[in-house]
């Protein structure tokens, strides 16, 4: 294989659910002078990027092909590690866990066990948020642990015209768009909105990107409630997708600060969403300026993949 090839391994995921990772990592690879390929295989003669989600068969294959702290393996860490578990949502002890992020479920117990079984084989670990970075660094692994700073990957040419054509000059069917796993905490917010006669469109979290794009254009704002009331970390990939695709959004404020906070529109309680829904257009001027400020601040950042060359 070409000496500057880099393999984006997707065999451990539903491809539709990681479209943003595939797109952004491909651009990062190109910007680092690499040629990305996307496969369901791991290769010994090139570098491989694996997005976290391990199982026994994948771990067995990695151990067969590679050695510990292997420079050919880079892991994209997508979850906070806490008390020996992958636990990004950090529900409070008094909260009922349900939906996708139930840390007591067999799925997360197995996924966490497989993570710790294989993490030492990676020479580089790329963390998609500050809180993930801090939690991985605390494990004192021999891998090179690096933070992936958010970037704008789009085109600044005709930025304002393109933003308006997507969000203002389009027919709106609903005020808010929501996609993601449902918990009692999230459901209580959605039910309050519906009771106030706010229109809400909900889609599956693994909907194809073309559907997500189309529905984002026909709704007023993408909605980002926390999983649980104690969830500490902003859903940064949701924010990054919206900023790069130039769609307005509103996120529930989390306690942990991030480098995206200055580019976000936040809410603290559902009553604020009801007020916003009365006239979605009033938040558009702030949304477009936030989006443009993000693009200007991050457009020329170096590729996160340069350290693994």
Q: Which residues does each PLM region occupy?
A:
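Short amphipathic alpha-helical surface patches that serve as generic macromolecular interface elements
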Residues: 236-239, 270, 274
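Short amphipathic alpha-helix with an adjacent loop that forms part of the alpha/beta core around
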Residues: 63-65, 277-280
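A charged, aromatic-enriched C-terminal amphipathic alpha-helix characteristic of glycosyltransferases
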Residues: 271, 281-309
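Conserved acidic donor-binding segment of nucleotide-sugar-dependent glycosyltransferases
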Residues: 262-271, 278-282
């Amino acid at each position: 294989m070409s000496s500057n090839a880099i393999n984006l391994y997707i065999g451990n995921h539903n491809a539709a659910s990681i479209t943003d990772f595939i797109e952004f990592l491909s651009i990062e690879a190109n910007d680092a002078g690499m040629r990305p390929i996307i496969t369901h295989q791991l290769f010994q003669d090139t570098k491989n990027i694996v997005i976290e989600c391990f199982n026994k068969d994948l771990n067995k294959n990695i151990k067969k092909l590679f050695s510990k702290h292997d420079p050919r393996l880079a892991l994209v860490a997508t979850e906070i590690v806490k008390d020996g578990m992958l636990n990004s949502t950090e529900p409070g002890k008094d909260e009922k866990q349900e939906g996708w992020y139930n840390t007591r479920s067999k799925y997360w117990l197995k996924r966490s066990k497989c993570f710790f079984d294989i993490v030492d084989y990676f020479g580089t670990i790329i963390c998609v948020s500050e809180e993930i970075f801090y939690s991985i660094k605390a494990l004192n692994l021999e891998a090179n642990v690096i933070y992936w700073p958010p970037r704008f990957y789009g085109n600044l040419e005709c930025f304002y015209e393109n933003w308006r054509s997507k969000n203002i000059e389009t027919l709106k069917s609903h005020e808010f768009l929501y996609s993601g796993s449902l918990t009692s905490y999230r459901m209580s917010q959605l039910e309050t909105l519906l009771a106030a006669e706010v229109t809400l469109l909900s889609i599956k979290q693994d909907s194809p990107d073309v559907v997500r794009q189309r529905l984002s254009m026909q709704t007023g704002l993408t909605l980002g409630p926390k999983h649980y009331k104690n969830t500490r970390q902003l859903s940064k990939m949701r924010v990054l997708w919206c900023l790069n695709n130039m769609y307005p959004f509103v996120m529930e404020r989390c306690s942990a600060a991030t480098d995206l906070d200055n580019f976000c529109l936040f809410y603290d309680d559902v009553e604020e969403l009801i007020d916003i829904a009365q006239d979605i257009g009033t938040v558009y001027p702030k949304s477009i300026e936030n989006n443009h400020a993000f693009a200007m601040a991050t457009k020329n950042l170096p590729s996160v993949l340069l350290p693994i060359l």
